[in-house]
């Protein structure tokens, strides 16, 4: 009887029983009246008369009047008090239930180690992401983002080479930049070591050159000197300080992203917990590009 724990189910069951009882009572009353009643009363002077059958000048039945009045009162309550002013919805109730569950989930798994986080992220990826990005996370031959390279220097190099689209920033789509691989690697090293919160690069010797190229090639025009992408308190371009972190991924999961093929939808409706959002980039960061 778990379904009785939901007050909507209880209300529906009670309403169904009331309707059933009233239907049986009214049906039996009408059947009895049809069997025992005799024609009586005055016919309406201007009423309908068809084949000798006329219309009595009777008042509207009390039951009809009561039904009409109850319907009007219910409609007034529904539109002005019950909904939408009280703002109840099944989606809202679902979100509250998921929020409560996420709090229990966070408390239960708050002390996860690195390996457990990676395993959790892998589970989330296989269920929600692998359909488009592939089991290996390589993007199914370009149909989706190659997540093996995302969040790393290789991902920045791909963006420099091919450009970026689909996040609807004020600066528009980032075009591909005509840089050779060495210069692209230098910029990627600088971004990962000095701008991104990751603060780590495989090529520390390229940081200084990468900084010069970052400023001279026009990257600061959209992303700013600090890489935050802000100009006069407006979000002009991607915030590179969050690249490779859960905050960057959270933004994509919340807003979705247009790709070369199709459109990645927003996953906001999934109501991922903070721990799940943290676990997903941990798994992605654990993946190693084939070049390595």
From Swiss-Prot:
Swiss-Prot/TrEMBL cofactor(s): heme c
Any one annotated GO CC term: plasma membrane
InterPro entries: CcoP_N, CcoP_N_sf, Cyt_c-like_dom, Cyt_c-like_dom_sf, Cyt_c_oxidase_cbb3_su3, Cytochrome_c_Oxidase_Subunit
Protein's pathway: Energy metabolism; oxidative phosphorylation
Amino-acid positions noted as binding heme c 2 in the UniProt annotation, renumbered to this chain: 174, 219, 222-223
Protein residues bound to heme c 1: 129, 132-133, 264
Alphabetically ordered keywords of this record: Cell inner membrane, Cell membrane, Electron transport, Heme, Hydrogen ion transport, Ion transport, Iron, Membrane, Metal-binding, Oxidoreductase, Repeat, Respiratory chain, Transmembrane, Transmembrane helix, Transport
Sequence ranges assigned to domain Cytochrome c in this UniProt record: 116-195, 205-288
Topology in membrane: Multi-pass membrane protein
Listed transmembrane segments: 11-31, 62-82
PROSITE patterns assigned to the protein according to its UniProt record, in alphabetical order: CYTC (PS51007)
Manner of cofactor binding, per the entry note: Binds 2 heme C groups per subunit.
GO terms (BP aspect): oxidative phosphorylation; proton transmembrane transport
Primary subcellular site in the record, as a coarse category: membrane
Subcellular location: Cell inner membrane
GO molecular function, one term: oxidoreductase activity
UniProt superkingdom: Bacteria
Record family assignment: Belongs to the CcoP / FixP family.
Function of the protein: C-type cytochrome. Part of the cbb3-type cytochrome c oxidase complex. CcoP subunit is required for transferring electrons from donor cytochrome c via its heme groups to CcoO subunit. From there, electrons are shuttled to the catalytic binuclear center of CcoN subunit where oxygen reduction takes place. The complex also functions as a proton pump.
NCBIfam families named among the record's database cross-references: ccoP (TIGR00782)
Assembly and binders: Component of the cbb3-type cytochrome c oxidase at least composed of CcoN, CcoO, CcoQ and CcoP.
Protein name from the UniProt record: Cbb3-type cytochrome c oxidase subunit CcoP
Lineage of origin: Bacteria, Pseudomonadati, Campylobacterota, Epsilonproteobacteria, Campylobacterales
